[in-house]
């Protein structure tokens, strides 16, 4: 099998303990909200759980802890006051905005996006998408589109997370930054 463009990012998440090696297959597969929360929680070291108001998440769901952690950390809200919709997919603009908010980024005024499909980016997302583009966290497709409403894939999330978290220093000694 030929290498996938996202393999280095997926490998990095495995090295960091964010994903298991068996979770890196099918990098083009759309990621669910629950899977996204699990990746973000592990990448950022979020562990503190809190109560959740969601009726569509039960204690025996594999993602219960991750939803409770994400909601408590404040980076993930429900799709309504009582639903988390953990099995729904996530769009590219949603994933970018969640990560940008998690990094305390602010909307970039002007909201001018250079993508040929920039008008398809939702109004609520434009400023944060612009900030993420300007910060080199996300780029569009080679055809100069962004695909705001496309499902975000496992490989795309891996690339976003690695760009947001950066490469940790894991060598002993003194480091000057």
Model regions and ranges:
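PEST-like intrinsically disordered low-complexity regions enriched in serine, proline, threonine
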Residues: 12-13, 70, 132
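Catalytic cores of secreted/periplasmic or lumenal enzymes
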Residues: 129
